[in-house]
Amino acid sequence: MTIIVDDAGSGDLLFGVVIGAYREDTDQFTYDVIDVSFYQEVFCEKKFLNEASRIVLKLIKKLKAKPGEKIQICQGCIFDTAVTDLKEKYGEEIISKIRVIGEPQRLVEESYLDEIRNLGYEPLKDRESKRAKSFFHMMKWIKTNPKRLKFAKTGWPRLKRYKLFSRVNKIEPCSKTICSKCGKTCEVPFKPDGSRPVFCSDCWKK
């Protein structure tokens, strides 16, 4: 028996990311969502990696993974932390990264499309084959009602080139630096100039 984990929406402007788990032997499928807030102001902190891991572990628990059951994970970098955590929990011999195709891919994709339709947006039929066209189609939908910005991954640094996003959410490229308090490497949404201390998100909250 094998459980296959895939994602949909990582490269799409709208909504968060759907993560689904599928047991091919029984056609069982379940999914959950990384909230879009992880792709907004805190995007450069990459907290979505830990959230992806949390969701994957929850979905596998929900499917009641059996001893020795193989778990195959999509090759996408969104699962880097999840793979590490899964290997620690279930063993390296159980976990592998694959290119997901077929039924699990279809189910996760359909779940993402259902979620964005729930926002009131109708996706392009050829969205997968025309990613650039889909991006601008989504952006146009947001532009007709700027209140829809709350549904967008506004933390993407590349969006700063578009007036629609820069005027609402001033997006700066993330810079790697050292936290002045704990000494750990962290990313901040500005370029440190050495004139003031810089704190990671954990130390900032303390």
Where are these regions (language model features)?
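RNase H-like, Mg2+-dependent phosphodiesterase core
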Residues: 1-181, 191, 195-206
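Short, non-ligating residues that shape and space the ligands of small metal-coordination modules
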Residues: 187-189
